[in-house]
Design a protein with these regions (language model features):
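Noncatalytic carbohydrate-binding groove/subsite architecture in carbohydrate-active enzymes
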Residues: 210-226, 258-412, 422
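Carbohydrate-binding surface patches
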Residues: 477-524
Length: 557
């Protein structure tokens, strides 16, 4: 990836000066209600946040019922579930030490390599897979048991499809078509769409499927092997993703797809190009209710999605209600907060705090587009995160006395808090473990766990989930410090953060609407729960020191 370097100022401390305000109590969600009257004024800030990267103040989002825990997904692989270092050849059982880590997160984006489940053309295997001997059934069953949503991302192309290309251009990231086929024709993507049908038939919720269309390979690989069993409607998956970063600009020519070509790809994947590709092709042919997620876009370019919509209007037409017959249910992109700009391919030198990046602006663009469409498809961010190795342009740096790991934790949690403000419905961090422990390249050391222990970022996610995972974001009442209000029924929680990366601190007076006490919850590295303490209020108000680590406050009577 190409990023731009630019200067980053040294850390300084800025103080916020408080104004005394007369607050009026009101139950109305209007500007005269108490929660809108929390105010703070600040001295000049060296890291000014552009207005387009700031949330609107006092805009009520109470119709948004997305729980905060939906912002705490993770990316992972089969071996994260099944590979026990004490018994590396046993892939029939969940490795419970790792599962304890995975349960920290609300969702798992599973990188499902197509070659694992269709090692030879037309022969589908799931338990065990012919490639690797993995038990996909067990992984999905355990995730459902533990309340973890799974997004199965069918990605890369299998060896037999690669082998249709000349040796010099074979790449498992090639577009999912045989060599020489048109990338503009949905029929060229029929092989991948057949694979999608088999996945949706097996793991979806529709049990009324013509069994003659199920093509599970039941042959044993050797004597004593456990054969695959053809199953349908197991009720384990609700979401499936078509590829990964198909808008890539790196790699060979065969790895690239335009927006129109990817729309043709998704049209086949979605419903067999409206059924034109025959039986047993496309997700919706197997389970009409399974949600098809667009492959995460590397460029975070909302225009790419608009071009896909335009292709659908031209090639798939309109529904009876006049809306475009889209080939996706969920809009999906990737964005890593740094001081570059992926949209312009400007090179970065370092990761930066999410609020200082383009993340808010980009999220706003995607959500605005989604809300302009009938049905308002959800917007997800399925890759984001920070490295801990200091050679990476995506690194989290140490700030003041705060370690790199502690700062990674702050920025990870603040990333979730940012995206829920803008209406993104789910976030998945990259990734559970380091891709290359000790590596120095970008994305090599982005793991949120290490060995069988959580890193601080995962500590913060677990603690926040336990405190208020079911709460929904209501509004932001201050931009600096950031003060967000969340609710669950008649309970209210405030989250306060300095949106900076200079070790800045501030005092802030929070009006809790007449509450006699405040319960203040502070994140703690290495713990399962936050530290909590009660403090008396003064006429329902409490003055807090706010830092770049979020603090959580609720009123008590």
């Amino acid at each position: 990836m190409n990023w731009r370097y630019f200067y980053k100022p040294a850390a300084i401390v800025i103080t916020i000066v408080l104004f005394n305000i007369n607050c009026r109590s009101s139950s109305k969600a209007t500007v005269d209600s108490v929660e809108y009257l929390n105010k703070a004024a600040s001295s000049p800030d060296t890291n000014k946040i552009d207005a387009k990267n700031q949330p609107e103040l006092n805009t009520d989002h109470s119709n948004n019922t997305v729980p905060l825990k939906n912002m705490f997904g993770i990316n992972g692989y089969e071996w994260n579930f099944l590979e026990n270092p004490g018994s590396p050849n046993d892939r029939k059982h969940i490795y419970e030490d790792n599962m304890a880590l995975i349960k920290t997160f609300s969702g798992m984006r599973h990188y499902l390599n197509w070659n694992r489940v269709e090692t030879t053309k037309g022969n589908y295997t799931f338990n065990p897979t012919n490639n690797g001997g993995w038990n996909e059934d067990l992984i999905y069953q355990r995730c459902k048991q533990d309340g973890i949503l799974v997004l199965a991302d069918l990605k890369n192309i299998p060896d037999w499809l690669q082998n249709t290309y000349p040796a010099s251009s074979r790449d498992n990231d090639n577009a999912p078509v045989a060599y020489g086929q048109s990338l503009n024709d949905p029929a060229s993507y029929a092989d991948q769409a057949r694979m999608a049908f088999q996945l949706a038939a097996r793991y979806g919720y529709n049990k009324n499927i013509d069994k003659s269309l199920i093509k599970v390979d039941t042959r044993k690989r050797w004597n004593g092997d456990i054969p695959n069993e053809p199953l349908v409607g197991m009720g384990l998956l609700k979401y499936i993703e078509c590829g990964n970063e198909r808008d890539r600009w790196w790699g060979g020519d065969e790895t690239h797809q335009t927006a129109e070509q990817y729309a043709a790809n998704m049209s086949a994947f979605y419903d067999g190009n409206m059924g034109k590709l025959g039986q047993g092709v496309g997700v919706k042919a197997a389970d009409p209710n399974m949600q098809v997620v667009m492959g995460g876009l590397a460029t975070a370019d909302v225009k790419f999605v608009q071009r896909m919509i335009d292709w659908c209007r031209t090639n798939r037409g309109l529904k009876a209600d006049g809306s475009v017959n889209l080939c996706f249910d969920v809009i999906n992109y990737h964005l890593y907060s740094n001081n570059g700009d992926v949209r312009k391919q400007k090179k970065a030198a370092t990761g930066i705090a999410p609020e200082l990046s383009i993340s808010g602006e980009v999220a706003n663009q995607f959500v605005k587009l989604a809300n302009s469409l009938p049905g308002h498809p959800e917007v997800w961010v399925t890759e984001t995160g920070y490295d801990i190795n200091q050679e990476s342009y995506q690194k989290a740096e140490s700030i003041g006395l705060k370690t790199v790991l502690a700062n990674q934790a702050d920025w990870i949690l603040r990333t979730s808090l940012l995206y829920i403000r803008y209406g993104v419905k789910r976030v998945f961090f990259y990734q559970l473990f380091d891709d290359h422990a000790g590596g120095t390249s970008q994305y090599a050391t982005s793991g949120l766990a290490e060995g069988i222990k959580r890193r601080p970022a995962a500590d913060y996610i677990l603690q926040t989930t336990r405190l208020m995972g079911d709460y929904s974001y209501i509004k932001t009442i201050s931009n600096d410090p950031l003060v967000d209000q969340y609710k669950l029924g008649n309970k209210t929680m405030y989250v306060l953060t300095i949106p900076d990366e200079t070790n800045r601190k501030a005092s802030y007076t929070l009006d809790l609407g007449g509450a006699k006490k405040a319960n203040i919850h502070s994140l703690k590295i290495g713990a399962d729960m936050m530290d909590s303490k009660h403090m008396n209020t003064t006429i329902g108000k409490i003055t807090l020191q706010v830092t770049e680590t979020p603090v959580f406050v609720e009123g008590l009577n």
